[in-house]
């Protein structure tokens, strides 16, 4: 919608651009279905109206799904939400990754590999390093990354750990890789408890 408004007629652009996003959506949604699509401004208003009404409908569906997720996750994994930085969306992504098959998660190392946070050796000469794992479930990897970002910004023990690792010469991507592995280790028992029941 922003691109369409940016290329719209100057009068329409002047009316819509200063509005806050939510007000702009409702304003565009109110555009009539009967706009004259043969005129450029009418066609733009028609397209903006269609897009805005679709956005509002999708927003209603997202809200309903978020409400369902907020009810299901605490029942499926009551202790998972106690892990610092794990919210409803993150817990949902981790639960989907864990699935209902506990046999595929034999250990926390197997869970880490499933999430793509197991270290991959990338040593050269006298330097011992590990690189990011590009495999595994990308949604779970992203969920662990979000937890790591929350912890790096608000969790003092994690911030202290990152400062210590930085002083040792580690780069930020290496620190995040290590944190994701630790978080996977911390989350695993909560998921295992869920899948064992």
Please provide the spans of the model-predicted regions:
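A detector of single, family-specific signature residues
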Residues: 1-197
């Amino acid at each position: 919608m922003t691109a369409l408004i940016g290329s719209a007629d100057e009068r329409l652009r002047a009316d819509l651009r200063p509005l806050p996003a939510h007000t702009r959506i409702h304003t565009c949604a109110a555009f009539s279905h009967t706009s004259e699509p043969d005129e450029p401004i009418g066609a733009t208003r028609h397209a903006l109206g269609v897009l805005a009404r679709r956005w509002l409908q999708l927003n209603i569906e997202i809200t309903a799904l978020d409400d369902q997720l907020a009810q299901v996750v605490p029942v499926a994994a009551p202790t998972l939400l106690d892990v610092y930085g794990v919210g409803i969306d993150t817990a949902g992504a981790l639960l989907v990754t864990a699935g209902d098959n506990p046999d595929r998660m034999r250990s926390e190392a197997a869970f880490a590999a499933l999430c793509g946070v197991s270290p991959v050796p990338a040593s050269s000469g006298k330097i011992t390093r590990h690189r990011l794992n590009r495999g595994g479930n990308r949604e779970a990897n992203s969920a662990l990354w979000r937890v790591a970002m929350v912890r790096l910004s608000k969790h003092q023990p994690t911030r202290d750990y990152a400062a210590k690792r930085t002083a040792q010469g580690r780069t930020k991507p290496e620190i995040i890789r290590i944190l994701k592995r630790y978080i996977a280790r911390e989350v695993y028992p909560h998921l295992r408890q869920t899948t064992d029941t």
